[in-house]
From Swiss-Prot:
It comes from the Eukaryota. This is Transmembrane protein 115. It is found in: Golgi apparatus, Golgi stack membrane. Homooligomer. Interacts with COPB1. May interact with LMAN1. Interacts with the COG complex; probably through COG3. Its main location: Golgi. The gene is Tmem115.
Amino acid sequence: MQRALPGARQHLGAILASASVVVKALCAVVLFLYLLSFAVDTGCLAVTPGYLFPPNFWIWTLATHGLMEQHVWDVAISLATVVVAGRLLEPLWGALELLIFFSVVNVSVGLLGALAYLLTYMASFNLVYLFTIRIHGALGFLGGVLVALKQTMGDCVVLRVPQVRVSVVPMLLLALLLLLRLATLLQSPALASYGFGLLSSWVYLRFYQRHSRGRGDMADHFAFATFFPEILQPVVGLLANLVHGLLVKVKICQKTVKRYDVGAPSSITISLPGTDPQDAERRRQLALKALNERLKRVEDQSAWPSMDDDEEEAGAKTDSPLPLEEASTPPGKVTVPESSLITLETAPLL
């Protein structure tokens, strides 16, 4: 153990040295608030449902609750989550987008958690749910990071025996936390934070995240139903589509838009905002393969032309005049057919 600690410290120092300012700042704030908890009561930094809403309105807790920890093992989880996000997500998104993602997930977890406990109080009239419950910690952001990893590298294998892929880790951890809660080994705010972190991060990445291809990610492998076992996916997908249709009617979400960019008669480019580049590349390869097979069949059928066909083609070439457009085109210039944009709205697979 004593031999492993220096190596772990050196490895952690190397990771933080190469990290961005955002990752370093988040780690520093987590450590500072944990050390501060030994000197003063930091409960005012956690989200307390009875104090978040009027008349108290502790709005600052939405920004601080995700960075406040009270145990050393929770601090380790927070630091590991931030470092993993910096190593795997920041190169894809950038430091600013990672900070936006962190803020969106933590604010959503605080609001949804406080609202859930407020509704629980209204059903039970138990003041514990208003003034004793404290929502804090990085479990909400951990859920968001796992959802983002499912989006970007869902096919990667985490465990080989038994084989576990990144795409199933979010729900596996949710099931584990649920079992710990049923065994009274885990407090309810931790389970609520992780669950709302999963939900809020998926909604943001699915519909609202801005990138070079538009907004959101409407890829089939990132649908809401894919978080569940295959036997439940049809039912979950149906319910998710009903909810999405309702949100579209109330103008909270927008319909999926497919854009067909027709650049020339020989090629058509189809772009769906938010689709995975790997899916697009795979479909393009399949389309090219089908096109090559069709061209090969056409060449085989026309391999032995008849003499009559040759004479007709020769007569057509000698009798037909040059096209007016080609004759009027100045040397060195090539006319390119104008492209048009066709926009279709389709219902997404949620």
